[in-house]
């Protein structure tokens, strides 16, 4: 046991020594890094990717002045595991945070520790989602767990505090206060600007819900998907907007209205979720909320008795989009505030700005909300990078990059040696426009949280530009193959199609190779199943 504990400590000591030595003799000012991450922000809801749903002019500025990655993806599409992967540069089976329940292996070296040791000042504001004392961070104010949308609590260096206001705006204010008043102007900085929004249950700021509740959004062509042509995982997942999205907690009906109309709650926390929000509001906030949402509720009460299931689905989809996209609007506002300050303070030229999400999200595609699957809407994530003087403004990149690449990329940018056990690759060559040396032609994915909320089965898989092969396991043994070019919506599983037999064989071999490369195995699959069943 003593040897097991000493090895990570030795690795950290070695990494910190290398980090401290890496910048000796470096005459050029080391760049600042601003890492902006929202929660569950679908790439479909960023106008730099597609403007069919909403406009995000400030986030788009990062793309317009930098690079947009069209094939960025995650290793495990769920909040805390994704964040642990970003911090460690490793797949989940190595850092231990395989799902939102499992603990993070705190012996792991995180890249902020290396920045701190190399003389960077480090700060983190917003949602981390695991742990109350992030390693390698000089100053932090982070939401406990998921956090609230209004009048949030924060864990800080000095204990817990509560701040009145809308959480997205509060996080922006905390970030800007540090930038303007407590940042040492003579020392390079690593700043984490981490938003809770637009995570479920999607409460917009007052200025935005007044606007977005008046909008109507186009329905995706697969909103009424019947899952024919897919396996049991898609059919049995509990992510359908009509069946599984909460009437009160998500669609914002008053709990008593469900009783009045005889609506069965979608979950055992449906009514409680909305009541908790009401209890969180100040009197002024509640009055403003009711002034907008009460008429929506009254209109629904009049219409509901004659609504078909299809009409109910369409109504819930519109309510979902109004609040989800309304929540994003405040994130975009905050990004604009930060970008403006960087310009005004003369910091832009030596500051790398990154915008991403911890994963993608379903906005009605396949009738779903939430994430988890290897299918594109949850597997892919937005990634925009602005680096003046290095990244060509308005450029695009379609190479396959993953969130586990972020740690090594940031370390590379800062000239800090990366630990040898990190599994990603620096994307600095791609940022410089050099794709010749980038030879990644496939990525590995593994999702673990089952049986649990949303009931998305455990699966791992391989994704190439042309195909996607996934193995669903635990209570099933099913394979799925999708032709990404000919079936971009992933509607038809071709695994048993004889025409794809050669493709399946090649991908299975390549998948086995990736599992070996990244240290994953059937033994680890069973280990995590056994540990999960003990909890």
Task: Give residue spans per PLM region.
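Formylglycine-dependent sulfatase
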Residues: 2, 8-12, 16, 21-473, ...
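Residues forming the ATP-binding cleft of Hanks-type serine/threonine protein kinase domains
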Residues: 485
